[in-house]
Amino acid sequence: MSVYKVIEIIGSSSQSWEDAATEAIETARQTVRDLRVAEVVEQDLDLADGNTITFRTKLRVSFKYEGE
């Protein structure tokens, strides 16, 4: 039987929502092993004077729980 833990992470990029999601996953991979599924939960923009400054993507990510 397998157990999975779910966390939410947010990535940001000046280029696109896809780059923001990729950045979030790449950063999470540095400290979380065995990532399984990433679901896009929310996307938003940081604006200044009506211009896009930052794309932000919130992800719900699951990974296999190994216990302590």
Tell where the protein language model's regions lie, with residue ranges.
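Broad gene-expression machinery/nucleic-acid interaction feature
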Residues: 4-6, 42, 54-60
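C-terminal structural segments of small proteins and small subunits
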Residues: 50-68
